[in-house]
Structures are given as C-alpha cells and as structure tokens.
Amino acid sequence: MKRRNFVQNSVLAGASLLTAGLLKADPAAAATTAPDTGKPFHLNYGIHDGMFKNHAGDDFIDQIKFAYDQGFRSIEDNGMARRPIDQQKKIGDTLAKLGMAMGVFVQPGLGNDTNLLASGKAEHLDKFIASCKEAVEVAKRINGKLVTVVPGDFVRNLPIGIQTGNVIEAIKKGTAIIEPHGLVMVLEPLSDNPDLFLRTPDQAYAICKAVGSPSCKILYDMYHVQRNQGNIIPTLNWVYDEIGYYQIGDNPGRKEPGTGEVNYKNIFKHIYDKGYKGVLGMEHGNAIKGKEGETALIKAYRDADSFM
C-alpha cells in the first residue's frame, strides 16, 4: 500500500473508532450535558432523597445540588421530621443558597393507620395536636410551608357522618396551631388499602370547606386519584380552589411520567394553564435502576414538561 493511501486509511479508521466511541458513550453522562441541562422546567417539580443517588451519591444535599444542575428547583422529603436537627438545618440552608423551594414533609409521629382522627378519641387528638406543634418547629428549620396529613383509618363502629365530624374538629384544632406560622396542612386521599378514611379529592374538599382555614388544603396525588377513580383533570377542576399541592406518579407501577397510562403532558399543561406556581412532588420510584434510570427519569420530565 502506498504511504499516502495508508495515512488516509488510518485517519478514516481513527475517525470511525472515535465516532463509534461517541455513539457508545455513557447515556447517563450524555443526558447531564444535554442542551437543556440546567434550564428550569415550566412547572416546579420536586425531587426526593434517593432519586439521583447513583449520579450524586447517598448524601441528600449532594443530590439536591445535582438536581439543581439538571433544572429542578424544589424538593420534598416525607421523612424530614425524622432527620437530625442539624441535618434539617443544612438542607434548609442549601435550599436557600440555591433558591430552591421546599415541598411537603409528613407531619411527625403520624402513620397512615395509626392517626385515627375519625374515632374522636382524646388519645388520638392529643397525639395529633402534639405533632402539629412539632411540625411548626421542623418547618422553621427548613423554611417549609407544607405538611402532609393523613386522618388514618375508618372506625367501623361509627356512622360515616360522625367520623367525618370528628376529622373536621381535629383538623380545626390543628390549623389553629399552624396557621399563625403560615404553615399549611395538605390532606392526602390515598389508595393504599380500603381501611383508609380519606380516599377521594371530593371528600377532602368537603372537609376543607368545613374547616374553613387557609391552612387546610388538599394534597392532590395523581397516582392515588388514578387508582381510586381516574378522571384526573375534571376532578382537579372541581376541587381546584382547595388544592394546596400536587404529587406525581404514573400507574401502574408508581414510576416517572411515561411509564404508565396517565397522560402527564396534558395534565401538566392543564395545571400550568390554571396558573399554579407551587411545587409538584415527584413521589414515585425510578423505573430503571442505576445512572441509566436516573437519566431516563430526567428525560421523562423534559418530555412531559414540553407542553409549551
């Protein structure tokens, strides 16, 4: 082979190898350097601990910083009240420095099946009142304004109207504690099991109207709405003036948008058009493990958020 041809062929071969290498590059790395990386989303989606641990490590603060670099501007943390106080403060400081918002945390000391407000019993009411006071202190450390409350299970030996009245009275007492501090409890209708008292947004709507406080609103978790009844957009419209927060999760599977049957792109556009400016909590898992799954999650939100 002539030297000139050898050089040309070598250059072409090298270019081919380089191209192949680029095509085989780590898709996770590619996603974090995409053209829209860092650009804020149209809506304010809130990540949770563990969502980006493969990219950023186990430290939640490092995950928050990574999420910020990907365009996310808020977090939620169900277990915030269980974290050490110094960690709560560090998370709050990190959010403040980055200009990020704090979504919901779950009211301390309450479980889905242990907070029996429907019973009307003093022991459950006292525990609830104490948890409201503790929630105020947690919120101060993290500059939070939203706390998730679940009334607990049905009490089978009481008529439903009596149970509803008991829940309303308990929530009134709770809002009297948190309202002076600008805190809002968001009541979450759930689909986890048939024993739960609060299951539908219209039921939560009636309770909020009866309580009559700006510190009592609905947590509109679209995963639970889809499982319980569907009809997400019309139901949203019916209860919109009492919605204080949204949570996301596709169904079946409770993973990121695009992995199930819910048309989140249309729903996000509807929420945006309604003028909502708050946080939408990403209360779901990652459909795929590892960095690849985290990259797929980011892309899923970019796709669902591309409604403009």
Regions found by a protein language model. Name each.
Residues 76-96, 151-155:
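Glycine-rich, proline-tolerant flexible connector loops at the mouths of alpha/beta enzymes
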Residues 8-22, 31-39, 98, 114-217:
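Active-site acidic/histidine proton-transfer and metal-coordination neighborhood
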Residues 51-53, 81, 108-111, 153-155, ...:
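Active-site-proximal loop/turn and secondary-structure-junction residues that shape catalytic pockets
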Residues 2-54, 58-68, 198-220, 224-308:
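Histidine-acidic metal/acid-base catalytic patches
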Residues 89-122:
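Mid-chain, structured segments of secreted extracytoplasmic proteins
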Residues 62-80:
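Catalytic domains of carbohydrate-active enzymes, especially glycoside hydrolases
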